[in-house]
């Protein structure tokens, strides 16, 4: 359940024991063990997590209880604008929020710094050795690529794998792109050479063979939506 009313909706039907945090007390990336409505209700685990860039929660239950939980959730949200949404909507939101997807922004050949999640690597806080530590230190000290946001001209969206050029030289690659309904802009995520990663740098997104058709674009602040993460922390 994601969106500004998600906490309000959950509070209508979540019961928590005294030993667990209430929904109103649940911090970012934390969870609570709870039940539907009362002590004898359906057992749940609710985490303050999501993949949308909005205030949101994820509800976990036994598979056999899922239909009943779904009905409770939809009934609680019927007056708050709650509607079902699929992966298409989720993908738009995560691109706007700059949230990475395996197979797009990263894979086994892309390090966390190139994928834009270098903050997850505990180089300063973990003294113990771990697999890949020495290599990650070197990669951080000598970055080659950087994840940036692009804003494209026109309404033809960039697709995963489209090349990014300055002149005839390829300097990057599109990892994800969409026409953002929230921002009303044509946006993309791009992994680009660090030497061309400054804000407002003008580039071109190549279509067809990368040369016959080009879409003008420029590097903008990343992520595109709520860069300070104020909504998810609200």
Where are these regions (language model features)?
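Conserved, structured C-terminal
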Residues: 1-234
């Amino acid at each position: 359940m994601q969106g500004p009313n998600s906490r309000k909706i959950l509070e209508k039907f979540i019961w928590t024991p005294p030993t667990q945090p209430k929904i109103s007390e649940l911090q970012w990336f934390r969870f609570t063990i709870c039940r539907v409505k009362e002590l004898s209700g359906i057992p749940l685990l609710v985490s303050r997590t999501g993949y949308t860039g909005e205030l949101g929660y994820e509800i976990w239950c036994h598979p056999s209880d899922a239909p009943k939980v779904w009905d409770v959730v939809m009934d609680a949200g019927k007056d708050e604008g709650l509607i079902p949404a699929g992966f298409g909507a989720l993908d738009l939101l995560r691109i706007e929020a700059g949230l990475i997807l395996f197979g797009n922004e990263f894979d086994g050949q892309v390090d966390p710094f190139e994928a834009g999640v270098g903050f997850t690597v505990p180089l300063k806080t973990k003294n113990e050795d771990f697999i890949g530590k020495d290599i990650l230190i070197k990669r951080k000290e000598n970055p080659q690529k950087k994840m940036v946001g692009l804003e494209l001209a026109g309404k033809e969206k960039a697709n995963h794998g489209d090349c990014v050029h300055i002149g005839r030289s390829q300097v990057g690659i599109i990892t994800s792109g969409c026409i953002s309904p929230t921002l009303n802009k044509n946006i993309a995520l791009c992994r680009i050479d660090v030497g061309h990663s400054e804000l407002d740098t003008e580039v071109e997104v190549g279509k067809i063979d990368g040369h016959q058709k080009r879409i003008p674009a420029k590097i903008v602040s990343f992520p595109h939506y709520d860069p300070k993460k104020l909504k998810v922390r609200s």
